[in-house]
């Protein structure tokens, strides 16, 4: 067994009370300062105490080189813009201003042969006059020999064989699923 400097048997598990370099923990050899640092330890937590703010850092209320936020300036009334749709709808006459109902604009991709809803007999008579005046004007230019022919030629009903690809996919007459959700299988069921 190892005997220490004082002649007693040393037990393996105890540290020596005095390390070989002395009691100092300073490994760089600088003289110890007895004055503690004025800064609080940055890892120390003081959640219940008063907050300590550094005194030498100036507080900024405005961003550097920027314009002030205007929070503390005198407030000016905000201009409210006029609503496009009044509270009661477009034909509402709450405020006494005459508002005329306008027809909704058609979407450019929608077909333009839809019939607009009209109120009263005026719209029906205008619609009939507009449809009847165009064929009569064309017939008057061509001559009186074409008056015996019908003014409107019925359009042929499209069939599966005369399908145009730009109108969408051809309707299917079978049960086969081409793109199933789990992926295409090599087994085919008929």
UniProtKB/Swiss-Prot annotation:
It is found in: Cytoplasm; Nucleus. Residues 1-113, 127-190 are annotated as: Disordered. The modification N6-acetyllysine is found at residue 11. The modification Phosphoserine is found at residues 30, 45, 69, 97, 144. Keywords: Acetylation, Cytoplasm, Nucleus, Phosphoprotein. InterPro entries: JUPITER. Its main location: cytoplasm. Transmembrane segments: none annotated. Belongs to the JUPITER family. Monomer. Dimer. Interacts with TPCN1. This is Jupiter microtubule associated homolog 2. It comes from Rattus norvegicus (Rat). The gene is Jpt2.
